[in-house]
Amino acid sequence: MRIMLLFTAILAFSLAQSFGAVCKEPQEEVVPGGGRSKRDPDLYQLLQRLFKSHSSLEGLLKALSQASTDPKESTSPEKRDMHDFFVGLMGKRSVQPDSPTDVNQENVPSFGILKYPPRAE
């Protein structure tokens, strides 16, 4: 969860830096005819997107902070199934205190005693 929070912070800083660099440019260019240049509508749309993304970014940060405060309750059955699947692939089993694993040695197949041929030197 910390990785997700770190990624969000880096994303927020990079967005703020990129939009900050755009806003530092001159906002209004005067055309000799007394009108405004064609960049003004684009700048207006860019500022609108910045404002909309700021509010959605706040919502994203709120959701991430709520998720990071209580990570144990947010585990879904799908996530648990995927965890069990990968643990099974790796061959590692965690012993749960409520489910002991007793292995009966009689039921375990064995290859018997391995005999090596005498060394020929």
UniProtKB/Swiss-Prot annotation:
Signal peptide: 1-16
Location in or out of the cell: Secreted
Compositionally biased residues, Polar residues: 96-108
Residues making up the propeptide: 17-78, 94-121
Keyword Secreted attached: yes
GO terms for cellular component: extracellular region; extracellular space
Keywords (A to Z) from UniProt: Amidation, Cleavage on pair of basic residues, Disease variant, Hypogonadotropic hypogonadism, Neuropeptide, Secreted, Signal
GO biological process, one term: female pregnancy
Major localization class: secreted
Function: Tachykinins are active peptides which excite neurons, evoke behavioral responses, are potent vasodilators and secretagogues, and contract (directly or indirectly) many smooth muscles. Is a critical central regulator of gonadal function.
Protein name: Tachykinin-3
